[in-house]
Amino acid sequence: MAGEQEQVGALGPLVGYHLRRAFGAFAADFAAAMDGTGMRQVLVGILAVVSGSPGINQGAVGRLLGIKRANMVSLINELVDMKLIARVVDASDRRAFSLTVTDAGRAMLTECLARIEAHEREMLAGLSEAERATLLDLLGRIERRDPAAG
């Protein structure tokens, strides 16, 4: 570690540098874990939110996940085309659509979550349960300071 610290110089003590490196490792392993499903992290996130809040509208999903409104339509269309989410005209506002997860969507979410749990177990194998809880707490504190997060 000391040799690596010297090689990266002034980056070594920067938390953002290490967050970016950790994210890169997580993202690459996540992509490998999802191989063959046709799913990406953003799609799994949307599917999970809609599953937990049946009837939610796409604007609310976007706000919860920090996805720009302009990107939500194509992402929802992708999930609808995959037959994982159904878009239904909202009875209270005919201009709006509510979202629900289909049976295929529930099965896909179950499959993805099992793969994600295995991916996280592998990635965090060197951490105790207490360290994982601390990591989640610390990351949550950083997220709550992010004005773009909501």
Where are these regions (language model features)?
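Helix-turn-helix DNA-binding motif, specifically the short coil turn and the N-cap/start of the second
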Residues: 57, 68
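The alpha-helix within a helix-turn-helix
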Residues: 62
